[in-house]
Amino acid sequence: AEEREQTAKITIGRGAKKRAAQLNGVDQPAASSLIGKFCAVVFSPDHLSLVKEGPSMRRKFLDAALCQRKPAYARLLSQYSRTLAQRNTLLKDISYHSELLETLEIWDEKLSGLGAAITIERKRYLERLSEAAGEIYDGISQGRERFAVRYDSGLLRDGGEEAGYRERLFSLLQNGRKEDLNAGFTTKGPHRDDLLVTVQEKSAREYGSQGQQRSCVLALKLAEAALLAEALGEKPVILLDDVMSELDASRQDYLLNKIQGWQVFITCCDPNSISGLSQGRTFYVENGAVSYTHLTLPTNSRV
């Protein structure tokens, strides 16, 4: 991490350039250029649906965590997304221009290389995340339940070495060509992968109680923070966005104990949800004005 103070600014507007980014007053080519400059782990009510929602939300969680650890991964992901979009466009165009079919192999080769690289990064990170989150879940459940998370990818189902992932994805794309042409989009690749979260070796999504699902998410987010701190050599900022009221008292206590000594920002609508805090500053918003005090909150304020 860079030790000198930096100022990042993102401007949201209208027109052709909807977002503009600056770092220390210098214009950046894209907002994505700021990735890795300010590292934070966000925990919001949306994340509580991480286990029970569809695969896209879990992929988004995984990719966001990896982008902060490795800004180069963000560029890899962007390249894959552009290549995927181009292949999908070609699949649709082929139905009207059959002579384009012979160009599909070029995109298969490019997509398989990028997809294999993404799969390797995700797989390696998930192995470490599962171990770290498992230890945290063990603490939340007081050793009563076993937690695990693993990467569910078409490239991994038959085993094999990482060196063979590119060739395997290329084969999947080739063999699935008819299906892709009928569908008009690419049906194989890391953009279709998922994370399988289990408690007691059963799917937390299908069989977990609401409490178990929330414990899983809490374990995953805290593990994300721990692994990011390890990679950076310093603790990232923790942002708890209106999530405290969604957790019961025991999970609130566990979360707050785990992040003692970290820089933490907590937003809430109910001041009572952070009444157990004994230190720090409280900022509150009233009629568009922001001020701060020391954990003495006005009623019905947004913190």
List each language-model region with its residue ranges:
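Generic alpha-helical secondary structure signal
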Residues: 33-36, 56-61, 82, 102, ...
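Long, non-coiled-coil amphipathic alpha-helical linker/lever segments
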Residues: 62, 69-122
